[in-house]
């Protein structure tokens, strides 16, 4: 059934959308697609690129934002999925599309420098850990040092200046 081909989270989001609940715009690269890509990545890469481009264009049109834009950047989440709920076991990348070139645009949209720099810091860490399989310890240590330097007891207490330094350090 559909849950096996799209994963538990995507399936439930689709069900919510079908009954009229507000859910974010999305698309799914289903299990058959991913299995085919996994069989021969080099041969299938052009089809993947074309599919991603068309789906990103659809999201841009629906949201009025543009992926990679310095003025109104579209940010996306990339989530792995499984047919059953597996809390904490599946990888997620949030705020994909946030780069040095899109930071100012997100700041203009949100007016919140702390949000922007914390999101960037988290994306850098997630990308390093999930995509490049870097250990989490250096990121945790850098966060602990930033908190100690500013007297923060929790990461939420770091101001955007500290988060900016932390994000730049982690790049």
Q: What are the residue ranges of the model-derived segments?
A:
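Nucleotide/phosphate-binding sheet-loop regions of phosphoryl- and nucleotidyl-transfer enzymes
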Residues: 1-171
